[in-house]
């Protein structure tokens, strides 16, 4: 919104022209979300404590987690608020890509909020019934997928970008909708599964968002898009603002979520952030890149699938406990060691993912 205001004021003072620069708005978007998150943190934590919105801990989990019982949860509210306010302030409100991400972010946030509410208020450890959770996730994802397909049909916006091959970009047609659905819903649940230790999910989210900020900038710049042999998408540049807002809000939240955590994001945060990352990947046509950069989320999800599949088929477990971060805890790794090592792996994967853009 401030961009539009600056455009009207620039005739009176040329300095307002700085608001038209994407790099400037990206920086202030990050800082706005960061400071909002830091400002909201103590207030949200205090309010959650007053309302007794404490974390529900499974009795069959690692013993070290029993001390987390009662820690305020649903802190994702401050992440979502910080991102939304920052994006509305610094992004062009006419950009359809921005609204797609915000729609998924808020929509999945509401689904996560209902799930958390049932857990912490109604003391229902299962939360929102799984089929209803997936139903609403699917509805939200399909609305965005069909909307973007209708707008970008038979254009580079619905092509499949294959890593390492610059000349292979098949037109997906209606398969675009199916791919978008699985990426958005899958990423949302993958981040949700990863959110099991203090700060474990938020830092890889920050790394991936930072990586996508660079990709969005290149995709929205015709010269760099042609240089990297990726589709040029004129609306993609504004996703830089969304990505930097996620980075800022994530870092602000980490201030309170780092070990030992003062607050957890809950499903209201993890489902929303995962859905937002999935949507950004789809809009940028970088679903394969998300698999690489979000490798930590992928491995966490695969560990659960393999664990459940192995137990049902063979009656045996592959890991001591799934998701895999619990496996390392039960092997005797201190929680901070698991967290930081997963962060390091995540950073490496993001750098590898960015490098693949040039290897074609």
Swiss-Prot record:
UniProt KW Nucleus keyword: no
Chain ranges passing through the membrane: 18-38, 72-92, 94-114, 132-152, 168-188, 199-219, 236-256, 263-283, 288-308, 338-358
A GO CC annotation given for this chain: plasma membrane
Substrates-to-products reaction catalysed: UDP-N-acetyl-alpha-D-muramoyl-L-alanyl-gamma-D-glutamyl-meso-2,6-diaminopimeloyl-D-alanyl-D-alanine + di-trans,octa-cis-undecaprenyl phosphate = di-trans,octa-cis-undecaprenyl diphospho-N-acetyl-alpha-D-muramoyl-L-alanyl-D-glutamyl-meso-2,6-diaminopimeloyl-D-alanyl-D-alanine + UMP
Localization: Cell inner membrane
Location, primary (coarse class): membrane
A Gene Ontology molecular function term of the record: metal ion binding
Keywords: Cell cycle, Cell division, Cell inner membrane, Cell membrane, Cell shape, Cell wall biogenesis/degradation, Magnesium, Membrane, Metal-binding, Peptidoglycan synthesis, Transferase, Transmembrane, Transmembrane helix
Membrane association type: Multi-pass membrane protein
Family matches, as InterPro entries: Glycosyl_transferase_4, PNAcMuramoyl-5peptid_Trfase, PNAcMuramoyl-5peptid_Trfase_CS
A Pfam entry, by short name: Glycos_transf_4
Pathway: Cell wall biogenesis; peptidoglycan biosynthesis
EC number(s) from the headed UniProt entry: 2.7.8.13
GO biological process terms, semicolon-separated: cell division; cell wall organization; peptidoglycan biosynthetic process; regulation of cell shape
Cofactor: Mg(2+)
Record-linked NCBIfam families: mraY
PANTHER family: PHOSPHO-N-ACETYLMURAMOYL-PENTAPEPTIDE-TRANSFERASE (PTHR22926), PHOSPHO-N-ACETYLMURAMOYL-PENTAPEPTIDE-TRANSFERASE HOMOLOG (PTHR22926:SF5)
Entry's family note: Belongs to the glycosyltransferase 4 family. MraY subfamily.
Role played: Catalyzes the initial step of the lipid cycle reactions in the biosynthesis of the cell wall peptidoglycan: transfers peptidoglycan precursor phospho-MurNAc-pentapeptide from UDP-MurNAc-pentapeptide onto the lipid carrier undecaprenyl phosphate, yielding undecaprenyl-pyrophosphoryl-MurNAc-pentapeptide, known as lipid I.
UniProt name for this protein: Phospho-N-acetylmuramoyl-pentapeptide-transferase
Organism (species): Serratia proteamaculans (strain 568)
């Amino acid at each position: 919104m401030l961009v539009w205001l600056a455009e009207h004021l620039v005739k009176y003072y040329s300095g307002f022209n700085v608001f038209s620069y994407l790099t400037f708005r990206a920086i202030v978007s990050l800082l706005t979300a960061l400071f909002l998150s830091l400002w909201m943190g103590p207030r949200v934590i205090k309010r959650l404590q007053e309302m007794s919105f404490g974390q529900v801990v499974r009795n069959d989990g690692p013993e070290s987690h029993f001390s987390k019982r009662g820690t305020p949860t649903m802190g994702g509210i401050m992440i979502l608020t910080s991102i939304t306010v920052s994006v509305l302030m610094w992004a062009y409100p006419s950009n359809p890509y921005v609204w797609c991400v915000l729609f998924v972010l808020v929509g999945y946030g509401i689904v996560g909020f209902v799930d958390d509410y049932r857990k912490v208020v109604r003391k229902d450890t299962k939360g929102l019934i799984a089929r209803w959770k997936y139903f609403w996730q699917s509805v939200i994802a399909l609305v965005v997928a069909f909307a973007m397909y209708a707008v970008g049909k038979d254009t580079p916006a619905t092509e499949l970008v294959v890593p390492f091959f610059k000349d292979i970009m098949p037109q997906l047609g209606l398969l675009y909708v199916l791919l978008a659905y699985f990426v958005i819903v899958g990423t949302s649940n993958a981040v949700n599964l990863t959110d099991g230790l203090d700060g474990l999910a938020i830092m890889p989210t920050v790394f991936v968002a930072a990586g996508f900020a660079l990709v969005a900038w290149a995709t929205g710049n015709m010269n760099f898009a042609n240089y990297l042999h990726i589709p040029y998408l004129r609306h993609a540049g504004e996703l830089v603002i969304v990505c930097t807002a996620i980075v800022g809000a994530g870092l602000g939240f980490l201030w309170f979520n780092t070990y030992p955590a003062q607050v957890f994001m809950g499903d209201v945060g993890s489902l929303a952030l995962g859905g937002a990352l999935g949507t950004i990947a789809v809009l940028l046509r970088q679903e394969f890149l998300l698999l690489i950069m979000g490798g930590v989320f992928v491995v966490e999800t695969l560990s659960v699938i393999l664990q459940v599949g192995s137990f049902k088929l063979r009656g045996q477990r592959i890991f001591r406990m799934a998701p895999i971060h619990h496996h390392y805890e039960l092997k005797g790794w201190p929680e901070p060691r698991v967290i930081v090592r997963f962060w390091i792996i995540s950073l490496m994967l993001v750098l590898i993912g960015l490098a693949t853009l040039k290897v074609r």
